[in-house]
């Protein structure tokens, strides 16, 4: 499956700063273990993609914008990046939405994937090298499920009508290491987030579905263990390890995926391939709320990217609004946050046309690099650019924070240095 066009990313002078990120499993900020820069071996990064039954809302976008920063900082450090993202294009929510709307589930999925691509391109998100749907990875899933069955890490339930295949929660010794949740929390989240603890025939209520035996009215594919379709978690295990290797560098997504999805995805891969950790670094982005209430389809309070841009809001302002708070924290979105981001964008655009101190711009870029490399500290990074812009305007006596007269700005040499860094590292075009 194709992704979307790659944005132009300026190359920067100066010294980049190696990236450190909070690791969910180890519960600390630590240097990201990656191949040496210039070695020709890419950094392997896997991020869970969408289930394509609705448009891209700010919660989705915030996650992909966080990993876009990671990609950009790695590029600045002269690393190649092999970025893989999946699309869960066969799953219950997709079927349910298609039935509700009276459309074919394939058509719904195709239309929403197209919208997602457009939103990501609009937001200048660097695309994955491999953008892989669950349907196109069916053979890979079947191979991994077969391996787990052969290793005794999975079993078929004793149900002649629906012989589903499940993974044993005891297949790995350190299950739970990624989320660090206690047993009660895991059981609660498993039931809330797509698990089936009461399914008859399971050996343990927490065993996860690997292969759902064919049901009437659902798509299915032939396999050695009967016709059916993939479970949610095994899809990501297979897609990631078939492209990045049995153990790779960075795995991540939204914090709501930490358990059960990421915990089980890692466990399936580790049991199948005999590795201790599927990823060296587990990274999770916080959730977005709307005016203090968590964004939810059921509440109808989603803010969609395409609606914001259709209303005339610039992609750069949307990015700055998301980056106003740290990626790991749950954070709010409001009209006031967007307005503040637009004012910030105008301030920076004013400064790049009048800034004269080249060394000050170089120093600001160094601060920007330092803050982003410190667990993507975007609030500090944006504040550093703010301080540079305010100083530049103060030096010239121009305190205007409106951008009307800067529709086609002529960058000064100092402004050009800063604008290139903001573009390359933050994905914001000035």
Curated annotation (Swiss-Prot):
Keywords: ATP-binding, Ligase, Metal-binding, Nucleotide-binding, Zinc. Its cofactor is Zn(2+). The keyword Glycoprotein does not apply. PANTHER family: CYSTEINE--TRNA LIGASE, CYTOPLASMIC, CYSTEINYL-TRNA SYNTHETASE. L-cysteinyl-5'-AMP binds at residues 48-51, 63, 86-88, 232, 254-256, 288. Catalyzes the ATP-dependent condensation of GlcN-Ins and L-cysteine to form L-Cys-GlcN-Ins. GO terms for biological process: cysteinyl-tRNA aminoacylation; mycothiol biosynthetic process. It comes from the Bacteria. Its EC number is 6.3.1.13. Monomer. A motif ('ERGGDP' region) lies at residues 192-197. A motif ('KMSKS' region) lies at residues 294-298. The keyword Zinc applies. A motif ('HIGH' region) lies at residues 50-60. Zn(2+) binds at residues 48, 236, 261. It comes from Corynebacterium efficiens (strain DSM 44549 / YS-314 / AJ 12310 / JCM 11189 / NBRC 100395). InterPro entries: Cys-tRNA/MSH_ligase (IPR024909), Mycothiol_ligase_MshC (IPR017812), Rossmann-like_a/b/a_fold (IPR014729), tRNA-synt_1_cat_dom (IPR032678). Signal peptide: none annotated. This is L-cysteine:1D-myo-inositol 2-amino-2-deoxy-alpha-D-glucopyranoside ligase. One of its GO terms (cellular component) is cytosol. It is an enzyme of class 6 (ligase).
């Amino acid at each position: 499956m194709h992704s979307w066009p790659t944005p132009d990313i300026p190359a920067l002078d100066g010294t980049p700063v190696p990236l450190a990120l909070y690791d969910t499993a180890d519960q600390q900020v630590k240097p990201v273990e990656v191949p040496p820069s210039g070695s020709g071996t890419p950094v392997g990064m896997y991020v869970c993609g969408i289930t394509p039954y609705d448009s891209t809302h700010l919660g989705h976008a915030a996650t992909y914008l966080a990993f876009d920063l990671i990609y950009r900082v790695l590029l600045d450090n002269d690393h190649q990046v092999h970025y893989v993202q999946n699309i869960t294009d066969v799953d219950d929510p997709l079927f349910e939405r298609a039935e509700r709307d009276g459309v074919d589930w394939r058509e719904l999925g195709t239309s929403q994937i197209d919208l997602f691509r457009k939103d990501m391109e609009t937001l200048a998100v660097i695309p994955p090298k491999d953008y892989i749907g669950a349907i196109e990875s069916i053979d890979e899933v079947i191979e991994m499920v077969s391996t787990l069955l052969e290793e005794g890490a999975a079993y078929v339930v004793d149900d002649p009508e629906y012989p589903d295949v499940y993974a044993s929660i005891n297949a790995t010794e350190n299950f739970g290491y990624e989320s660090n949740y206690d047993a009660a929390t895991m059981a609660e989240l498993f039931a809330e987030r797509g698990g089936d603890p009461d399914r008859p025939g399971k050996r343990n209520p927490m065993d996860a579905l690997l292969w759902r035996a064919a049901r009437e009215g659902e798509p299915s594919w032939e396999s050695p263990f009967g016709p059916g379709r993939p479970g949610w978690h095994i899809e990501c295990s297979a897609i990631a390890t078939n492209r990045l290797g049995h153990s790779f560098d960075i795995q991540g997504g939204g914090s709501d995926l930490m358990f059960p999805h990421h915990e089980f995805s890692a466990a399936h891969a580790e049991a199948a391939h005999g590795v201790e950790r599927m990823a060296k670094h587990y990274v999770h982005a916080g959730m977005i709320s709307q005016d203090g209430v968590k964004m939810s389809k059921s509440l109808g309070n989603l803010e969609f990217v395409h609606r914001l841009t259709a209303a005339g809001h610039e992609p750069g302002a949307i990015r700055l609004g998301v980056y106003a708070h740290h990626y790991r924290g749950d954070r709010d979105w409001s009209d006031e946050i967007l307005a503040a981001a637009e004012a910030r964008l105008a301030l920076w655009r004013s400064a790049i046309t009048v800034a004269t101190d080249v060394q000050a711009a170089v120093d600001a870029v160094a601060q920007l690099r330092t803050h982003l490399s410190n667990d993507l500290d975007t609030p500090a990074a944006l504040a550093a650019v703010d301080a540079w812009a305010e100083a530049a305007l103060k030096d010239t006596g121009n305190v205007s924070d409106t951008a009307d007269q800067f529709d086609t700005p002529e960058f000064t040499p100092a402004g050009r240095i800063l604008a290139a860094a903001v573009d390359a590292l933050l994905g914001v075009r000035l």
